Amino acid sequence: MVIKLKNKKNDYSKLERKLYMYIVAIVVVAIVFVLYIRSMIRGKLGDWILSILENKYDLNHLDAMKLYQYSIRNNIDIFIYVAIVISILILCRVMLSKFAKYFDEINTGIDVLIQNEDKQIELSAEMDVMEQKLNTLKRTLEKREQDAKLAEQRKNDVVMYLAHDIKTPLTSIIGYLSLLDEAPDMPVDQKAKYVHITLDKAYRLEQLIDEFFEITRYNLQTITLTKTHIDLYYMLVQMTDEFYPQLSAHGKQAVIHAPEDLTVSGDPDKLARVFNNILKNAAAYSEDNSIIDITAGLSGDVVSIEFKNTGSIPKDKLAAIFEKFYRLDNARSSDTGGAGLGLAIAKEIIVQHGGQIYAESNDNYTTFRVELPAMPDLVDKRRS
């Protein structure tokens, strides 16, 4: 996966000003230093060189003067320029050693991140932009670590809950099968009743085992999409038909409000899983003898699908329902409780489709809304 980073301009003005002032100071100091030295040795340097030429090389005064004139005095500007350059290089080396402290500060800040120390990262005033970035990164890493620990704790709690819930139907299955085994001459009606109860408990046990596998698979696989042209209206109708027995048992009804030609591009299996999870929650937490409204349609350049049911979700829980291993039913009811992965996976699937999912709730109703990118031909068709 290729991540494109935005070329965001950062404010390094303080550092730039300091660097500029250092450069100006180096040039000025080098020039002043060379000119000062020149003024100090003016006249003295010539006499000293003439003395060496006359005494060490046995030159007469006139020859020594000519050699000094042609070799040194006529090239004095070059010597001055060379001296200035050398001075600048020396001062630059000193300046670089001063600037090295900024890298030391950054390294210290990175060490704080690596060692996860509980303290703020502090840099020089000129590095305030980098200081803010490092502290932001530190807070982000700390939050991710806390979220990971919280998710792991929830996962452990869910595993414990499911282990407890598995024991309940398993105990019932063993009990009823023992009765059937001990009383082969049991009346047919009673035997049929026990078999029916045992079968229901076995189905529940299968569901809980599937939840265990769901927990195992969640962090081991990446959601991949196989997109195709989907008849969204037909998918919603088929889904509500499948939920009819579960809904009718409590006097509930799912009503679809959507155009029959509504289509969308996506992975049919993954989207069906999303809608099934939402409807499953609506069926589990809505009031008896109520209607679950499913409204779908084109809104601008997105296809919107809403599930509205009676009942409310507290605000503190509403903000967390899309987190993995989060369960609304704190009592972990064996009939409605799950691993808390349904809505978390639903969100991942919708995000993979380039859409979004969110929930709203008031005192009377709860609404889950899914928005998916509309196909261009559908948008053009509705506009024409």
Curated annotation (Swiss-Prot):
Protein's name according to its UniProt entry: Sensor protein VanS
Transmembrane spans: 21-41, 76-96
Species for this entry: Enterococcus faecium (Streptococcus faecium)
Effect of substituting residue 168 to K: Reduces phosphatase activity, with phospho-VanR as substrate, significantly. No affect on autophosphorylation
Modified positions (Phosphohistidine) in chain numbering: 164
Catalytic reaction annotation: ATP + protein L-histidine = ADP + protein N-phospho-L-histidine
Topology of the protein relative to the lipid bilayer: Multi-pass membrane protein
Regulation: Phosphorylation of VanR inhibited by EDTA.
Lineage of the species this protein comes from: Bacteria, Bacillati, Bacillota, Bacilli, Lactobacillales
Record carries keyword Disulfide bond: no
